Amino acid sequence: RFFKMDYKIRIVRYLYFFSFVSLLILYLFPGSLIGYLFYGDFSRQPDIIPNPLGTSINHTIAFFYLSILGLISYMRGTSFKQTLIFLVVVSLILELSHLIIPNRSFQYSDLFANLLGTLLAIVIIFLYKRLKNGKI
């Protein structure tokens, strides 16, 4: 079945899985790898986009990106709903893992930002499907 799938969807799935593994590494590492790359300091979180929300915007962007890839990857099959549930559960588990990982801290604002990124992706996919089917 995998080899019969459209090559564009296959590329999106590869990108989704690569992005998911990258997100796991970034989330579960005790400290900020990106902070180390930018500032030489594992304890510093960079702001991708300067804003009043601080680093939580990074979470929204990351989960929006991951959710868009995941939902596009499985848009045609029954796995769409399973992918959606998976993304929400991963969001919760990853942020809760910061309670036990050294040099990381659980923050409700980050959890909200994770879920917001996933929700924005769902809305965009929903609107795209309706537009594609001529219902908008």
Question: What residue spans do the PLM features occupy?
Answer:
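Bulky hydrophobic segments
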Residues: 2-109, 115, 119-136
